[in-house]
């Protein structure tokens, strides 16, 4: 699901809300999450999951075209861990699809 699809689905589900308000709400939430992660804060949404940063140390990589060694600097990457309720819900729905 893309951001546009999420906005459209929410607008359909809540017809009393103006589509522009739904779009603004989704964009505001995602922007606030991005700002929090960029400042090093952890985000926890109970029942859904948590977002935090994982540290990747510097390493020597390879250029796939030339095969030469390339220095890859250290960095932090966003990481999502699904909460228990979400894991159970996904597991249950995948079991129903298999049947």
Curated annotation (Swiss-Prot):
| Any one GO MF annotation of this record | structural constituent of chromatin
Which InterPro entries would you find in this protein's record?
Hist_DNA-bd (IPR000119), IHF-like_DNA-bd_dom_sf (IPR010992), IHF_beta (IPR005685)
Q: Which CDD domains match?
A: IHF_B
Q: Gene3D superfamilies this protein is in? A: IHF-like DNA-binding proteins
> Which SUPFAM superfamilies does the record cross-reference, listed alphabetically?
IHF-like DNA-binding proteins (SSF47729)
- GO terms classed as biological process: DNA recombination; regulation of DNA-templated transcription; regulation of translation
Q: Write the record's keywords in alphabetical order, separated by commas.
A: DNA recombination, DNA-binding, Transcription, Transcription regulation, Translation regulation
| GO CC terms in record | chromosome; cytosol
What is the role of the protein in this entry? Answer: This protein is one of the two subunits of integration host factor, a specific DNA-binding protein that functions in genetic recombination as well as in transcriptional and translational control.
HAMAP family annotated for this entry? IHF_beta
PANTHER family (UniProt xref):
DNA-BINDING PROTEIN HU, INTEGRATION HOST FACTOR SUBUNIT BETA
Assembly and interaction partners: Heterodimer of an alpha and a beta chain.
Record family assignment:
Belongs to the bacterial histone-like protein family.
What this protein is called in its record is Integration host factor subunit beta
What species was this sequence derived from? Answer: Laribacter hongkongensis (strain HLHK9)
């Amino acid at each position: 699901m893309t951001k546009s699809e999420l906005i459209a689905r929410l607008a359909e589900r809540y017809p009393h809300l103006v589509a522009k308000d739904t779009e603004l709400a989704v964009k505001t939430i995602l922007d606030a999450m991005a700002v929090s992660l960029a400042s090093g804060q952890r985000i926890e949404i109970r029942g859904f999951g948590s977002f935090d940063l994982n540290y990747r140390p510097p390493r020597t990589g390879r250029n796939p075209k030339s095969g030469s060694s390339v220095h890859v600097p250290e960095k932090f990457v966003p990481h999502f861990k699904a909460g228990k309720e979400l894991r159970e819900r996904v597991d249950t729905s995948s079991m129903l699809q298999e049947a």
